[in-house]
């Protein structure tokens, strides 16, 4: 093994990167790639072919912005490669051929995607070794557990992922159709009804900020509708927006997807259904170790509400919800822990193994 391992957690909304053994990621930037809208004119005045992360955000007026990861799954590999290139060379300032790499993946990531990630790391970046791990499994590891159920809700996807002795149980992983981006869009819709229009990509970022600063989960939705108070939020241009029950109505989509016009179970019911798909002997361990992870679980009040609704499903079971601080990057922290273990080198796919077996080696070594 060459230098210390680089850990990259690629989320739909944010990319987190840093060195194994660190407590927090060194780099966090939006998972976006911007291409100039008018290519020829832009090139003449010295602009680049593409921009990544914060730089793409700052130039969003002249760029077409794209998220290469949607609902946790990569959908544009050229843009994804740009994000990794930016991560290594601009954010981390390392030569990728000198460092083993740990990448994270969404639960139920298609096999072809895992192979493509592996291929790009070895062929485009000449990594000496690499490993792929499921985000929720790393989040559980970050909480100091090997068995439990992780309720992971980020910007693009939410999942209930039961894990036994460090291995996810794929047959029982369930996806929830609401995540952070849905909350932001729903809040924008409600603000429009109040007469505040947020239409551009730039304005949507303001809505996201309002959500992150003011949103919360109501313990009792109907009661909260009667008693909710209003708050003011100052926009960058100095105007003031008044926000009332929108503060908790936006996060209610995690519990009542009908608000988004969908007919699917909310977070507590999906978590319960996931546990019930597992062997009866381990259910007690899952109910007793429910770990929240991902940025969307940072919304105040979520743990109490999940506890209340799960208890209604299973009144006799002891239910324990763990909401670690810093859980918006707990997958990265779990990756940092895993990649600093003395056994990590044996776990990795080496360049030699890749050259002998090709990308499909990832299914044998990373599970």
From Swiss-Prot:
UniProt subcellular location:
Cytoplasm, Cytoskeleton
Query: Can you supply a Gene Ontology BP term from the record?
Result: phagocytosis
Can you tell which superkingdom this protein's organism belongs to?
Eukaryota
A Pfam family reported for this protein in Swiss-Prot or TrEMBL: Actin
SMART domains the record matches: ACTIN
PROSITE patterns attached here?
ACTINS_1, ACTINS_ACT_LIKE
Stated EC number for the protein is: 3.6.4.-
Q: What class of enzyme is it?
A: hydrolase
Alphabetized, the UniProt keywords read: ATP-binding, Cytoplasm, Cytoskeleton, Hydrolase, Nucleotide-binding
Q: Which Gene3D superfamilies match?
A: 3.30.420.40, Actin, Chain A, domain 4
Give the matching SUPFAM superfamilies.
Answer: Actin-like ATPase domain
Question: Its Gene Ontology molecular function terms?
Answer: ATP binding; hydrolase activity
Catalyzed reactions? ATP + H2O = ADP + phosphate + H(+)
Gene Ontology CC terms: actin cytoskeleton; cytoplasm
**What exactly does this protein do?**
Actins are highly conserved proteins that are involved in various types of cell motility and are ubiquitously expressed in all eukaryotic cells.
Query: Which family is it part of?
Result: Belongs to the actin family.
Name-wise, this protein is Actin, spherule isoform
């Amino acid at each position: 093994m060459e230098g210390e391992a680089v850990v990259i957690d690629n989320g739909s909304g944010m990319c987190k990167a840093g060195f194994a053994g660190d407590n927090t990621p060194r780099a966090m930037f939006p998972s976006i790639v911007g291409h100039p809208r008018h290519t020829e004119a832009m090139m003449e005045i010295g602009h680049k072919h593409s921009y990544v992360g914060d730089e793409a955000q700052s130039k969003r007026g002249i760029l077409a912005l794209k998220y290469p990861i949607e609902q946790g799954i990569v959908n544009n590999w050229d843009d994804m490669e740009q994000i990794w290139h930016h991560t290594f060379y601009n954010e981390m300032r390392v030569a990728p051929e000198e460092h083993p790499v740990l990448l994270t993946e969404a639960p139920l990531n298609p096999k072809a995607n895992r192979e493509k990630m592996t291929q790009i790391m070895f062929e485009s970046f000449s990594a000496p070794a690499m490993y792929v791990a499921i985000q929720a499994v790393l989040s559980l590891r970050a909480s100091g557990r090997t068995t439990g159920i992780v309720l992971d809700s980020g910007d693009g996807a939410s999942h209930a992922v039961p894990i036994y002795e460090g291995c996810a149980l794929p047959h029982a992983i369930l996806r929830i159709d609401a995540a952070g981006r849905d909350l932001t869009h729903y809040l924008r819709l409600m603000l429009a009804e109040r007469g505040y229009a947020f239409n551009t990509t730039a304005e949507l970022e303001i809505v996201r900020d309002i959500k992150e600063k003011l949103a919360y989960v109501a313990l009792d939705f109907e009661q909260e509708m009667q008693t909710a108070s209003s708050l003011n939020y100052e926009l960058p241009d100095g105007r003031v927006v008044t926000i009332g029950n929108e503060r908790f109505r936006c996060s209610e989509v995690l519990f009542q997807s009908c608000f988004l016009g969908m007919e699917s179970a909310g977070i507590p019911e999906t978590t319960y259904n996931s546990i019930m798909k597992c062997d009866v002997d381990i259910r007690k361990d899952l109910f007793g170790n429910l770990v929240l992870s991902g940025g969307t679980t940072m919304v105040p009040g979520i743990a109490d509400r999940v506890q209340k609704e799960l208890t209604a499903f299973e009144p006799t079971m002891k239910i324990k919800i763990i909401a670690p601080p810093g859980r918006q990057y707990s997958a990265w922290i779990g990756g940092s822990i895993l990649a600093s273990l003395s056994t990590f080198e044996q776990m990795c796919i080496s360049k030699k193994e890749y050259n002998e077996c090709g990308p499909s080696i990832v299914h044998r070594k990373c599970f």
